[in-house]
Regions:
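Long, distal/terminal scaffolding or interaction modules
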Residues: 1-239
């Protein structure tokens, strides 16, 4: 189904999505917020730029955006996939606890903030370009991958990555010699076991966006995890 949303507010747009089943293509999207919030079993393609909180509370749908997206993509996402053929704004994956977000380009500040795993759910976010400051802030679970493709000399992450990180894992396609991590996390070169896990995420990314998986994986990766011997203590209540 083709849905022209020019001039439509987000409430009317979401109501139209709920009333229709099957594959839906949204045309002339221009900043409408909360698209597909909390929706299940939808396949949505968006032509245009969606506003903040795209796919918030998503619970099993697939969203493809053929452009950039704004802030808080996948906020508190539970299940499903969000695929962005462009860049995303700040706070992508805020508190997501399941599902996958794939971004062809760059991410703004605070990507993966408060990301967490829930029971058998493990959220995954793959950023093809670079990520801004405070990547993985307060990360409690899940996986963040940053590939730094076409970065043209730019650092793969901004300032203060992993601040407050106390769970989960991060893969960075770089030796990270110019990245300053907090003392409460451990950054080390990826080993064979790490690369086996990483291959799953990178393969899916490359299939979506047309990159060569072997070429991407040929570069060195750094794995970042919380340091159990030196955890953040002042930010959290002890169990």
């Amino acid at each position: 189904m083709l849905l022209n949303v020019k001039g439509l507010d987000y409430k009317a747009l979401n109501e139209a999505l709920r009333q229709n089943s099957g594959d839906i293509t949204i045309e002339n999207c221009c900043g409408q917020r909360f698209i597909a919030a909390g929706m299940t079993d939808k396949n949505i393609t968006i032509n245009g730029v969606p506003g903040n909180a795209l796919g918030a509370y998503l619970n099993g749908s697939t969203i493809i955006v053929n452009a950039n997206a704004q802030d808080a993509v996948g906020d508190t996402m539970n299940e499903g996939e969000i695929i962005i053929h462009g860049n995303i704004g700040d706070a992508a994956g805020y508190a997501m606890r399941g599902g996958k977000i794939f971004v062809k380009g760059n991410a703004g500040y605070r990507a993966g903030i408060h990301m967490k795993a829930y029971k058998e759910k493990v959220p995954v976010m793959v950023i093809g370009g670079t990520a801004g400051s405070f990547l993985g802030e307060y990360q409690a679970g899940g996986v963040i991958v940053v590939l730094g493709l076409e970065a043209t000399g730019k650092k793969i992450v901004g300032f203060f990555p992993c601040t407050g990180m106390h769970g989960g894992k991060m893969f960075l396609r770089s030796e990270c010699k110019d990245v300053k991590f907090p003392s409460q996390v451990t950054a080390r070169p990826a080993d064979e076991s790490d690369m086996k896990e990483l291959k799953t995420y990178v393969t899916e990314y490359c299939d979506l966006f047309g990159y060569d998986m072997n070429e991407v994986l040929a570069s060195p990766f750094t794995v970042v995890t919380p340091d159990s011997k030196n955890p953040y203590k002042q930010m959290y209540v002890a169990n």
